[in-house]
Amino acid sequence: EILDLGTLDTKKGRPAQVLNACRILAEQGETVVLEVVGPITILNGLIDLRAVFKGMRKNPELMEKVFRKIEDDLSSYMQAAVAAGVKIISYGDAVATVPIMGPRVLKNYTEMNVLPFLRRMESELEHKALILLCPKTAYALEGTESASYKPLGMPQGTHPTYEDGWLFAIGKFGFMGQMCIKAGKRRVPEEKLYGIILKDEGDEDHEQ
C-alpha cells in the first residue's frame, strides 16, 4: 500500500502549511529548525515493526523499494524546507536502535540505507542547511565506521552552547549530532564541539 501512494506534494496540505510557517519565520529573521524523522520511525507509525523487520529478512527487494520511496519524499520535503529558509534540519530515526532492531540488522540498515541517504542529502542541500542528527543515528554511523567526528574549529574563549555550535557549523559542515537537540542551551568547550564527516564512497570501493 505504501508503494501505491502518490509522490509527496510539498505545495499541498500539511506539508505546505508547515513550509509556509517556516518561510514566515525565516522572513522575520528567525533561525528555523525543522524536525524530520527517518523511514523506520515513519513505518513504526503505520504498521507493526515486526512486519518491517520480517520484510527486511524475507523480501529485501520489496523493502528497499519502500525505503527508497520514503527517502525520495523526505528528500523533496527537506529540499523544499531549505528553499523556504530552514537553516537546521533535526533528523533522526530513533526507533532504529540495537535494542529494537538487533546489532546485525541495524548495521546493515545503517550502511545500506542511512549512509547513502545522508550522502544524498548532503549533496542536494550543498551545506545550505545543517542536518542535526539524533545521537542514536550518529552513534550508529560512528559504530559502523560510516562516519567520524571532526572539531568545528570554533574560536577559543567564546564559551559556546551546543546551539552556538549549530549556527557556526551552517555552511561549513553537513552534519552534527553529538548530543540531543534538547541540550541546545548546554555549554560545551569549543574543542569539544564536533561536526560529522560521512565516510566517502571511495573508501568503500577501496575496502572492497
Model region roles, listed by residue range:
Residues 10-208:
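Active-site loop segments of alpha/beta catalytic cores
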